[in-house]
Amino acid sequence: FFCLQSDVPFHGLTGKGKYAWLMMQAKEVNVKVGISFVSIEKARQNVTSRGFEAQQRYAEKAWECLLSRIQITGNVMQNRMFYTALYHTMLMPVDRSGENPYWPTTPYYDDYYAIWDTYRTSSPLLTLIDPDRQRDIINSLLNIYRHEGYMPDARSGNCNGRTQGGSNA
């Protein structure tokens, strides 16, 4: 589900399920989009009240808070490589608490990389630098198992993935 809010009125709308074509006279259009796995109403609630610049500052501050948990000293290239890698480890799994259409328990995390790989890399790192998030991720996996009878090796879009051969932790 999605909710689109535009600062410019549009006079026509066409579409067939997977796309929409909006016709507007303005050269610049500011659009806010809220998405939800649950409902249109939830998508409306997920549209931020902040403007673009304020939302950008909010996101930068949130990422700075996470990335600053580890301080390194190196040259510019080394720092860029390290913090880019750290950023990538923090992207997934995604906290989708309140967005699970199948059961209401929280926390709910989705979009897992293959766990057989991450249990020996990013999971220990998260245990050290963000233990509350790691606890919530593990509880979310346990809830997935309780409700679906299968511990996912990978998961995306509320669906378990059976992507890797072998066994994980």
PLM segments and residue spans:
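Acidic/polar, glycine-enriched structural segments that form the non-catalytic walls/loops
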Residues: 1-111, 143, 147-151
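Aromatic-rich carbohydrate-recognition surfaces in CAZymes
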Residues: 114-118, 122-169
